[in-house]
């Protein structure tokens, strides 16, 4: 399970060191993809394969499903962390997430998110009240 918030630095080569506590779960490979709110998502390879297969099973005559599958496939990079636990983020991924040297890696239960630190802090400030009032239909089973 991926829990917690960490603030690794992005180096000049676009490498980011993953938190040590997550490296075993990602040892079988990982998939980096564009996510909501101009963040990046890191999935263990096996979990991503399940997600991608589910997405690919959607009706191909549905324009929204087609667009989602296209964006998911085109925006994903498969990697293995190096011996120091670093991954290299592509220029496209760094641009999409507006990443500076100051980054945040945050757990999202079954995947990780990568944010620019300033964007993460803005997001937290903008959404604090939403979290306090999390009673929407999609959350009714858990809150």
Curated annotation (Swiss-Prot):
This is Transcriptional regulator MraZ. Its main location: cytoplasm. Keywords: Cytoplasm, DNA-binding, Repeat, Transcription, Transcription regulation. GO terms for cellular component: cytoplasm; nucleoid. One of its GO terms (biological process) is negative regulation of DNA-templated transcription initiation. Pfam families: MraZ. It comes from Rhodococcus erythropolis (strain PR4 / NBRC 100887). Belongs to the MraZ family. Residues 5-47, 76-119 form the SpoVT-AbrB domain. Forms oligomers. The keyword Ribosomal protein does not apply. HAMAP family: MraZ. InterPro entries: MraZ, MraZ_C, MraZ_dom, MraZ_N, MraZ_sf, SpoVT-AbrB_dom, SpoVT-AbrB_sf. It is found in: Cytoplasm, Nucleoid. Coiled coil: none annotated. The lineage of its organism: Bacteria, Bacillati, Actinomycetota, Actinomycetes, Mycobacteriales. SUPFAM superfamilies: AbrB/MazE/MraZ-like (SSF89447). GO terms for molecular function: DNA-binding transcription factor activity; transcription cis-regulatory region binding.
């Amino acid at each position: 399970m991926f829990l917690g918030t960490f603030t690794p630095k992005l180096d000049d080569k676009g490498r980011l060191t993953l938190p040590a506590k997550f490296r075993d779960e990602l040892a079988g490979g990982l998939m980096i993809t564009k996510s909501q709110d101009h963040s990046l998502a890191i999935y263990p390879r096996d979990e991503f394969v399940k997600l991608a297969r589910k997405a690919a099973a959607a009706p191909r005559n549905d324009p929204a499903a087609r667009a989602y599958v296209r964006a998911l496939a085109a925006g994903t990079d498969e990697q293995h962390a190096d011996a120091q636990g670093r991954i290299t983020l592509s220029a496209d991924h760094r641009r999409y997430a507006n990443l500076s040297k100051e980054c945040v890696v945050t757990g999202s239960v079954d995947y990780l998110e990568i944010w620019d630190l300033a964007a993460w802090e803005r997001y937290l400030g903008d959404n604090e009240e939403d979290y306090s009032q999390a009673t929407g239909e999609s959350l009714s089973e858990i809150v």
